[in-house]
Amino acid sequence: MAKKLSSPKEYKEFIDKFDVFLFDCDGVLWSGSKPIPGVTDTMKLLRSLGKQIIFVSNNSTKSRETYMNKINEHGIAAKLEEIYPSAYSSATYVKKVLKLPADKKVFVLGEAGIEDELDRVGVAHIGGTDPSLRRALASEDVEKIGPDPSVGAVLCGMDMHVTYLKYCMAFQYLQDPNCAFLLTNQDSTFPTNGKFLPGSGAISYPLIFSTGRQPKILGKPYDEMMEAIIANVNFDRKKACFVGDRLNTDIQFAKNSNLGGSLLVLTGVSKEEEILEKDAPVVPDYYVESLAKLAETA
């Protein structure tokens, strides 16, 4: 059963139990463009106590550098090597695991974050933010679109400019069984400014349904994300706690990764009633109203 943290004594005991804290960002540190009040105090406290901090996000629209800048703008100290968005884990997978040949490229259904990270590892790509694809499908497109042996993977993430044209291109590339089908994350929704919008999982579904193929998922709660982190940061998993706002990704990620603990904050997607359900499929070790509460130690 999940333990609710609700007193200064409990906050302190919780913090003292772990050496490493891994944080989701959207719904934990901020919601959309709005910082969650009081969170900076908690982050400063953890830094002052010498805790190791790692930021892990399924948001694929931003590169590591862009994420670092956003975190810093919210008054939270962060270094590039502490930041792991799904765009980074996806590019790492393409380069180090898929080992895409130099003559192959990736078709991106997503934003600049994915493109930036692919550029960083030297992987060629098309699609993505190409402005020529932000339009309706034309009759001449139907004649031109088809399988392309030079496309070695379709990488799908959050795409704010998704079009039927992009779907048609991705669909055709995926007719080649040797073309890998990759998904940055399967989040059904995307929290922003107190609202929920369709997420990467929802954007990928037309391709899953139409091709009959299942993508390799590279974000939380899957191992590929933790492997990308562990390849760069060494820590004792049993002394680490993941802090997130979504049960089926953040908390499940902590369990899949065999971390020492998990903390759900109630400032994002999942709510207290979901934890308290009799047969709740995923339950955190701890939960708290807001990350900001942890600064109220005795």
UniProtKB/Swiss-Prot annotation:
One of its GO terms (biological process) is cellular detoxification. Pfam families: Hydrolase_6, Hydrolase_like. Gene3D superfamilies: HAD superfamily/HAD-like. Its EC number is 3.1.3.41. GO terms for cellular component: cytoplasm; cytosol; nucleus. GO terms for molecular function: alkaline phosphatase activity; phosphatase activity; phosphoglycolate phosphatase activity. The N-terminus is blocked. Homodimer. This is 4-nitrophenylphosphatase. It comes from Schizosaccharomyces pombe (strain 972 / ATCC 24843) (Fission yeast).
